[in-house]
Design a protein with these regions (language model features):
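Extracytoplasmic "Venus flytrap"
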Residues: 45-64, 68, 72, 77-90, ...
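Flexible loop/hinge segments that line or gate small-molecule binding clefts
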Residues: 111-150, 161, 260-268, 320
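N-terminal Sec-pathway targeting helices
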Residues: 1-18
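Hydrophobic alpha-helical segments within soluble ligand-binding/sensing domains
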Residues: 88, 143-168, 180-181, 208-212, ...
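Short, solvent-exposed amphipathic alpha-helices that sit
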Residues: 57-74, 151-155, 178-196, 210, ...
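An alpha-beta-alpha
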Residues: 46, 65, 153-196, 200-201, ...
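Hinge/cleft segment of the Venus flytrap/periplasmic-binding protein
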Residues: 10-15, 24-36, 189-190, 279-325
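Hydrophobic alpha-helical
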Residues: 105-121, 186, 199-200, 204-264
Length: 325
């Protein structure tokens, strides 16, 4: 058991240290001052702004979008909102002023992000929403999203298939609709099933460094808890660290959404019970397709939903643990 806990502590420590480092290296080396490659007069310029680049998922999503655009001879200007909606609104204004032809956007907050979307809409610049929806979806040219609600459903179904009862804690990100939908899908699925009880929840903002202290407080308040449902892999890693620190690893099941390489490795090693995989490569491909449609007459669809899949110890190795699916 000490060896198992040591492996978990090492894995979480690596995740805590490596994720910010990767984000820094990404910004320094893959994204120069304007976060773009060289421009030429014949290239079309697209913009992108994500809720945070301190998350490998958004780094991967951006790299995939950039790759598709560069295959067409075009370029991408990327901005990091750093979990600040007002900053993101200003980034959209700056991208519009820079003359981009379309903007990919993952909103920081699903409701107040509308201000930024209106800035682009008023300037005739189409917005392609990726990963997390906005409150007024009609303002966007198209929204390309994972099936976030169903991701929560799949986690809950698995839990009910392996346990007759559960005392559950939630790690949430309520201002991001994608995270809220995952948790809602989970809650709706277990609702009314005797023996399955949600004891409490905490706001992690989807960040590993926030999730650990939040989970520590939840464990103090609800020492009888034995299941964690986290909105994403970074939150799950922080929650796992708190569980391990409290010596409760043996009794806890931990669920998450992302399917990150680190998350899949945790599932394969038995630390995570399951992670519901998103497919950033499919999201990026569809988002770029819709962006080109938007600047060439308009999108045929206002929303594209990309399927998710639950990864457990039984099937995770089919997807590989060295990269995203």
């Amino acid at each position: 058991m000490k060896k198992l806990r040591g492996r978990l502590a090492a894995a979480v420590a690596v995740a805590i240290g490596v994720i910010p480092l990767l984000a820094t290296l990404y910004l320094l080396y893959w994204c120069p001052a304007d976060l773009s490659v060289r421009q030429t007069g014949e290239q079309r310029v697209f913009g992108a702004t994500y809720m945070t680049m301190n998350n490998p998922y958004f780094q991967m999503l951006d790299a995939q979008i950039r790759g598709h655009l560069e295959l067409q001879g075009d370029i991408l200007l990327t901005r990091d909102a750093a979990m600040d909606q007002q900053r993101q609104n200003q980034e959209i204004r700056e991208l519009v002023d820079a003359g981009v032809c379309a903007i990919f956007m993952t909103p920081v907050e699903w409701d107040t992000s509308v201000e930024g979307v209106r800035i682009a809409a008023d300037a005739g610049v189409p917005i392609i929403v990726v990963d997390a929806p906005i409150e007024d979806a009609e303002l966007a040219a198209c929204s390309v999203l994972s099936d976030n609600y169903y991701a929560g459903v799949l986690c809950a179904r698995h839990l009910m298939s392996v346990r007759d009862s559960a005392k559950i804690l939630l790690l949430e990100h309520i201002t991001a609709r994608s995270g809220a939908d995952r948790i809602q899908g989970f809650k709706d699925t277990i609702y009314g099933h005797e023996g399955f009880e949600i004891l409490g929840s905490g706001e992690s903002d989807g960040q590993i460094e926030n999730a650990m202290p939040v989970m520590e407080r939840l464990l103090e308040d609800y020492p009888e808890a034995d299941v964690l449902m986290a909105l994403n892999d970074p939150s799950a890693f922080g929650g796992l660290a708190a569980i391990q620190g409290a010596g409760l690893s043996d009794r806890f099941l931990v669920y998450s959404v992302d399917g990150s390489p680190e998350g899949k490795a945790m599932v394969s090693s038995g630390f995570l019970t399951a992670t519901c995989a998103q497919f950033p490569s499919r999201i990026a491909e569809e988002a770029v397709k819709q962006a080109y449609a938007a600047i060439n007459g308009g999108c045929e669809r206002k929303e594209v939903i990309v399927a998710v899949e639950l990864l457990t110890e039984e099937n995770v190795d089919q997807y590989g643990i060295d990269g995203w699916q």
